[in-house]
Design a protein with these regions (language model features):
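Aromatic- and Gly/Pro-rich donor/ligand-binding loops
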Residues: 1-147
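Mid-sequence, gly/pro-rich, charge-dense loop/helix-turn segments that line enzyme active sites
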Residues: 150
């Protein structure tokens, strides 16, 4: 007997959903740049099969409530987080909220494509301010997954 996996994935929209250009911009389905949409779509398409159901959660969620974690635990088998340049100054508050959420879920968490963003000539010591946030995020994920995709 084949069982169906129910997956919750961070992303702007399902690649199966038909939306207009105006809806895409108005609802920020790009996640502020088209690379986010392309990356999330590729993860979705890789996982999509007759044995998976994938719900796309959007980008604007505030992931840190106990109720949200309880709902995820009750309804899903896996949480997929396609990230690109999440280790950057303006994303750290959201990364910290994801850490809180991940610490509350009991299902496997898969992170793909995460990395740091900095200017080509920047002093990497300028990234030290986020070390604690990045470390806590990675610890939370690795308690629920064997690895983190970079």
């Amino acid at each position: 007997m084949v069982t169906t996996q129910k997956i919750l994935m961070r992303g702007g929209k399902s690649p199966l959903a038909r939306v207009t250009y105006d809806e895409t911009l108005r609802n920020n389905l790009l996640g502020t740049n088209s690379g986010n949409l392309i990356f999330a779509d590729s993860v979705f398409r890789t996982l999509y099969s007759k044995n998976t159901t994938i719900d796309v959660a959007g980008y604007s969620a505030k992931p840190n409530t106990k109720e949200q974690a309880e709902k995820i635990n009750a309804e899903y088998d896996m949480l997929i987080l396609p990230f690109a340049n999440a280790f950057r100054k303006d994303f750290i508050p959201l990364l910290d909220r994801f850490t809180k959420l991940i610490n509350q879920v009991k299902i496997p968490v898969v992170v793909t494509g995460i990395g740091a963003q900095a200017a080509i000539n920047s002093d990497l010591s300028e990234l030290d301010f986020m070390k604690d946030s990045v470390t806590e995020f990675c610890k939370a994920v690795l308690q629920r997954s064997a690895s983190i995709g970079v």
